[in-house]
Structures are given as C-alpha cells and as structure tokens.
Amino acid sequence: MPITQNYGTGRRKSSKARIFLRKGSGNITVNGRPLDEFFGRETARMIVRQPLELTKNVANFDILITATGGGTTGQAGAIRLGIARALVEYDASLKPELRKAGFMTRDAREVERKKVGLHKARRATQFSKR
C-alpha cells in the first residue's frame, strides 16, 4: 500500500523548502532533525507551526521537510509557505482561511543589489559641502 502524502514547496529570500505532509501524530522533521533541535529560536518554530495551528491540524500530520539556502528566518518563512501549500493540496477548503491569514502569499522581498560607486545598495560616501 503506497503512503499517501501531500507536497508543497516554499521559497523566501534565498531559502527553499520542500514539504511532505503525511497523516500522523504531529512530528515535524527538518533535514533529519526534530523541529525544536533544528531551530534554536522560538520565533522560528512559531512561524513554522502557524498554518497548522490556524487550521487546527497540529497533531494530525507528520511533516518531513528539506530546507536549503539562506538563514533561519528565511528558511522558517519558506517552510511556512510550503506547509500552507501542502495543506491546501490536502484540503482545498482551507485555502480562503490560509489566504486571509497571509500564509499563501510568497514574500517577494529580496536583497537589493549593491550599486557601482556606492558602499552598499544605497549607502553613499559622506557628502562634504566644502
């Protein structure tokens, strides 16, 4: 008997996450490690759990996550989007609720490129009147 699972991808900044949602007891594994071990910060763990708490599915699924690139905040945001997409694939009636909460929208903000002649993207040399 094949394992039925739902799949979702999420991206944020330079992070990418692949999410596999299976019926289970609420275990969340990121890159082979438990969620609490993978993310040191409590805020990152809260971000990951938001779609599940909103739809009251915290203890209904086992989630297997592969996250690459970026930092902790970017990966947490990518995972949140991926989980939301996987939940919609599982049950399309959850989509309006997740969209209203903003979990279905990809955060398009990226790092602005450094410009030639400037120190950073916008930081210029100090202006001297004389």
Curated annotation (Swiss-Prot):
PROSITE patterns xrefs: RIBOSOMAL_S9
Any single GO BP term: translation
InterPro entries documented for this protein: Ribosomal_Su5_D2-typ_SF, Ribosomal_uS9, Ribosomal_uS9_bac/plastid, Ribosomal_uS9_CS, Ribsml_uS5_D2-typ_fold_subgr
SUPFAM superfamilies xref list: Ribosomal protein S5 domain 2-like
Alphabetical list of Pfam families matching this protein: Ribosomal_S9 (PF00380)
Any one Gene Ontology cellular component term annotated for this protein: cytosolic small ribosomal subunit
Family: Belongs to the universal ribosomal protein uS9 family.
PANTHER family noted in UniProt: RIBOSOMAL PROTEIN S9, SMALL RIBOSOMAL SUBUNIT PROTEIN US9M
The protein's name: Small ribosomal subunit protein uS9
Biological source species: Xylella fastidiosa (strain 9a5c)
